[in-house]
Amino acid sequence: MIQRRRPVPFELGPVHFIGIGGIGMSGIAEIMIRIGYTVQGSDAKASANTERLEKLGARIFIGHDAAHVEGASAIVYSTAVKADNPEMVAGRDKRLPLVRRAEMLAELMRLQFSVAVGGTHGKTTTTSMVAALLDAGGLDPTVVNGGIINAYGTNAKVGEGDWIVVEADESDGSFLKLKSTVAIVTNIDAEHLDHWGDFDAVKKGFQDFIQNIPFYGFAAVCTDHPEVQALTSRIENRRLVTYGTNPQAEVRVSNIEMGPEGATFDIIVSPRAGEAVRYDGLKMPMAGHHNVLNATAAVAVARELGVDAEAIAKGLAGFGGVKRRFTTTGVANGIRVVDDYGHHPVEIAAVLKAARAVTPNGKVIAVVQPHRFTRLRDLMTEFSSCFNDADTVIVADVYTAGEQPIPGVDRDALVAGLKKFGHRRALPLENPTALPRLIAAEATSGDLVVLLGAGDITTWSYALPGQLEALTK
């Protein structure tokens, strides 16, 4: 039985989550269970997330049926849930409150001071890093993340402190419902245009995200990114803390070195008023220039919240990472296999740069499962030119994510695009069962294989080391 940790304003019946196993939904559901709500929910299939919630006391339904919402007091849903879902239809018929995921997250944020982490890329890792530094500083935050934090074994936790750290999802514009005390913007790229319509609308969304903070709060923004730097000129009456590698950044990272064990770097803080503060010789067991920038954002926020230099260094050195962010799934015959969620060209390029940095004497072999036909169509040029740090690129079929195929936008089109843009070795993957033998033919001891995508390619990455071992027996 879970102890009720905070009072709720009314006695409510069960709160029903449609798609409760989703990474964003499951985190909110877990927090609500832990603060005293009765939670139930449905999903198309059982998963590690639904099993974890069931152990915490949630009632879980597999499949969707109108009968599941009997007795519910409210329904929480995400934009992935269609209007004709039988549970949505039943909820409307019963005149139950239908609450968007972000709206429920905003309700949880009202209970504490909050840090909301936004940006096209890097949100999940940066959220985890902020949480790690606040934990190291004794602030014991509540956390709602978009990925499994290895240190917690879950994507959410209830802390005893005054702060909540959340990942702010811009994909459907719902992050504008989050009224945070502190905001972070890591970068801004042309993504999720199916919702926003055009890039100007995306940029305006991030401007509003920052303007939503109160006068006593602040936003940490990465001015290494040109669109974020441009954004700073449009923000009025809100405090900004800039960070990056450039000399104009208030929180500047320098002397970055990559090695097999991760990154080392220095940070110097040069506030507009007051003396400069140095953090020299910081170590982080995570590769990639992009992750150093994510860590710099976390340092910028942590020091503003009162975390001292010793705790910051300890928190970074002990950072356990996030599942599906450059996660090593095994080593077979000297070949390292890595799983990564990267599915946008900017993310893929950053991951491959990190892979190259930690594999100085071996080959980098990328296996990519494009995610959504519309994304591949809209960014075909970018996808065709973002794999330069991979010696070999193996392209799988597109993961549909519920979309219908688009003529001329498929695996073979991307292979052709890679070759057109000058890649020397781009290969199609006929089916997942062919992957082990293809990797065995391409890779030797000392090489790194990274599997990229937001679909079910993650299951291939965990199976691959054992499959490679079996081929040599």
Curated annotation (Swiss-Prot):
One Pfam family per UniProt: Mur_ligase_C
Subcellular location as annotated: Cytoplasm
Cysteines joined through disulfide linkages: none
This protein's UniProt keywords: ATP-binding, Cell cycle, Cell division, Cell shape, Cell wall biogenesis/degradation, Cytoplasm, Ligase, Nucleotide-binding, Peptidoglycan synthesis
Primary localisation category: cytoplasm
A molecular function GO annotation: ATP binding
GO terms, biological process: cell division; cell wall organization; peptidoglycan biosynthetic process; regulation of cell shape
Listed transmembrane segments: none
Residues bound to ATP: 119-125
UniProt-listed Enzyme Commission number(s): 6.3.2.8
GO cellular component, one term: cytoplasm
Domain of life (superkingdom): Bacteria
Reactions listed under catalytic activity: UDP-N-acetyl-alpha-D-muramate + L-alanine + ATP = UDP-N-acetyl-alpha-D-muramoyl-L-alanine + ADP + phosphate + H(+)
Pathway: Cell wall biogenesis; peptidoglycan biosynthesis
HAMAP family hit by this protein: MurC
Function: Cell wall formation.
Family of this protein: Belongs to the MurCDEF family.
Name of the protein in question: UDP-N-acetylmuramate--L-alanine ligase
Species, as recorded: Caulobacter vibrioides (strain NA1000 / CB15N) (Caulobacter crescentus)
